[in-house]
């Protein structure tokens, strides 16, 4: 127990990969933590995130020792607009356990999905975009490099998904197959100095007899552009299972579209005690065309887009008319005239 507390202290003393607003020049992903950031991956960005983990569990009351292998995966895609993404997120786990009360006991095995969820996330509020549009304070270096009251206002998103759970699954409360909802409220604060605070409020399996309610708090620090550290606390409670989990780790940006990571998970209870190590990576296919200003919404946004569309149509019509006149009357298209010397003909 003492060694586990020491390890926990180390994790908390350190400071998920760097997460920033909307589409970014480098990959924006949720690994290696368990929380969801408030921002989407960006329109037309397809992103794959996955990892592999090994762990050990010991249950004091059941007298069992378990060796576990898990694979977690996530596929995320931004579509229609910058604020929206759809995703498939899940974890598959295989356990091999023995009864420690029996000498030379045979190992028993069980495997299934701990979670498998299809859902969508929408960014409801982004306080950072307007600041980017306004630009920095040109009269005060200090104002641009200190935490301000405005930094306490987070970006907010809502996630809604459906859990697909199979029959006779030892990792879920239901004995039969079911499809049930999951809701997540995510907030994200980006602070000066490369610090990010993410919080998730979670309501899971809320239509079942044993719903789960919980939270995740993640703190990220990026001391450089290619390296980041994180610590995380997750708590959840239901009649089926309750726990407090602590995670910590680091991630390295190999290229703007590729990141690798390593992390550790532990808890402080003994029914069961849990200790896991994980490695993983994330890669994105960046088909993003242009960044949108999210404030261009509603009537103002429609008028702006209508005006831009009208300008494009006007230019096309003008060019078409000029081409027709040039063909019929050998007139020079003013759009194509380079303004050069006429060779002295006039």
Predicted regions and their residues:
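Bacterial Sec-dependent N-terminal signal peptides
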Residues: 1-27
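Transmembrane beta-barrel domains of Gram-negative outer membranes and organellar outer membranes
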Residues: 22-206, 210-263, 267-346
């Amino acid at each position: 127990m003492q060694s586990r507390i020491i390890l926990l202290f180390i994790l908390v003393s350190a400071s998920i990969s760097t997460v920033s607003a909307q589409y970014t020049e480098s990959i924006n992903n949720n690994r290696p933590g368990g929380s969801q950031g408030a921002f989407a991956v960006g329109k037309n960005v397809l992103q794959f995130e996955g990892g592999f983990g090994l762990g050990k569990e010991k249950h004091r009351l059941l007298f069992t020792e378990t060796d576990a292998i898990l694979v977690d995966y996530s596929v995320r895609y931004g579509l229609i607009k910058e604020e929206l993404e759809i995703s498939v997120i899940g974890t598959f786990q295989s356990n091999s356990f023995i009864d420690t009360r029996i000498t030379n006991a045979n190992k028993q095995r069980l495997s299934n999905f701990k979670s498998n969820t299809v859902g969508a996330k929408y960014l409801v509020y982004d306080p950072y975009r307007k600041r980017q549009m306004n630009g920095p304070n040109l009269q005060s270096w200090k104002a641009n490099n200190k935490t301000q009251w405005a930094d306490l206002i987070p970006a907010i998103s809502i996630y809604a998904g459906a859990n697909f759970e199979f029959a006779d699954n030892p990792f879920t409360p239901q004995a039969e197959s079911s499809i049930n909802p999951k809701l997540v409220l995510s907030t994200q604060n980006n602070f000066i100095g490369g610090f990010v605070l993410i919080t998730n409020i979670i309501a899971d399996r809320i239509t079942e007899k044993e719903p789960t309610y919980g939270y995740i708090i993640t703190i990220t620090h990026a001391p450089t552009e290619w390296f980041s550290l994180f610590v995380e606390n997750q708590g959840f409670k239901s009649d089926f299972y309750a726990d407090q989990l602590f995670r910590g780790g680091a991630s390295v940006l190999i290229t703007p579209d590729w990141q690798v990571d390593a992390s550790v998970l532990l808890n402080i209870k003994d029914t069961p005690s849990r200790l896991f190590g994980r490695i993983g990576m994330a890669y994105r296919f960046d088909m993003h065309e242009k960044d949108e200003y999210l404030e261009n919404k509603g009537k103002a946004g429609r008028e702006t887009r209508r005006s831009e569309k009208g300008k494009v149509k006007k230019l096309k019509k003008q060019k078409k008319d000029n081409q027709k006149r040039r063909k019929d009357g050998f007139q020079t298209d003013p759009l194509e005239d380079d303004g050069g010397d006429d060779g002295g003909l006039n």
